[in-house]
Design a protein with these regions (language model features):
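N-terminal amphipathic alpha-helix/helix-capping segment at the start of soluble metabolic enzymes
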Residues: 1-32
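Glycine-rich phosphate-binding active-site loops on the catalytic face of alpha/beta enzymes
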Residues: 20, 90-101, 123-140, 160-184
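N-terminal active-site wall of soluble small-molecule enzyme domains
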Residues: 11, 42-103
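Short, acidic/polar
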Residues: 23-37, 78-80, 111-117, 164-167
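Acidic (Asp/Glu)-rich catalytic clusters
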Residues: 32-39, 64-68, 119-120
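Glycine/Thr-rich beta-alpha phosphate-binding loop at enzyme active sites
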Residues: 85, 101-151
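Conserved, mostly hydrophobic/aromatic
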Residues: 20, 43, 82, 118, ...
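Short, hydrophobic beta-strand segments that form beta-sheet elements in well-ordered domains
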Residues: 18-22, 72-77, 87-94, 104-110, ...
Length: 184
């Protein structure tokens, strides 16, 4: 598996198994959620609902809190922005992360076709594994299809969509990310 990592990923801390994804709906309690994450987890800062200056300020605060607990921090956006803002990694679609400087890339995918487009990915977030509040009514992958797609990946796969510790066990998958799981 080590040969699959880019040079940027090799310089990064070990890839966390548990991730929290920021969102407008968990923003008010994200600090509390960060404290509940196991040490050395990951955080993907999206905060699309904020203006750029406010988003930067929020990112800097969350990054400090996350780093104090040994968490890795990925910024949703292109690789240039992630590098400028001092993120550990960039998070986005295959198209958003196709170019730019060498930073670790976490690419959001929903199908085998999108996985093929994620050529510069260091890891992929495959969703939706299960029903999710983010995309109500959207078709899900389910455990079987999720594992079939994940088995074709050349890079680590992180499950997203309706995930929490119980869903990860049901999916039989070690790496997972969630928006709501740590708010309970």
């Amino acid at each position: 598996m080590a040969r699959c990592y880019s040079g940027a990923m090799a310089r990064m801390k070990p890839l966390p198994t548990v991730w929290i994804v920021s969102d407008a709906r968990n923003d008010a309690s994200i600090e509390r959620a960060l404290a509940r994450l196991p040490r050395g987890s990951g955080m993907i800062v999206r905060h699309y609902h904020l203006a750029k200056a406010d988003r930067r300020q929020r990112f800097d605060r969350l990054k400090r809190l996350a780093w104090a607990r040994g968490h890795l921090v990925a910024l949703a956006g292109d690789a240039r922005m992630a590098r400028r803002w001092g993120a550990d990694a960039a998070y986005g679609s295959p198209a958003t992360l196709a170019g730019g400087p060498a930073v670790p890339r976490l690419v959001a995918i929903h199908s085998l076709r999108e996985m093929r487009r994620a050529a510069r990915a260091d890891a992929v977030l495959l969703s939706p594994a299960f029903p999710t509040r983010s995309h109500p009514g959207k078709a899900i992958l389910g455990p079987l299809r999720f594992r079939l797609i994940a088995a074709r990946s050349q890079v680590p796969v992180i499950a997203l969509g309706g995930m929490d510790g119980h869903a990860a066990k049901r999916l039989k998958w070690p790496r997972w990310a969630a928006i709501d799981a740590f708010l309970r």
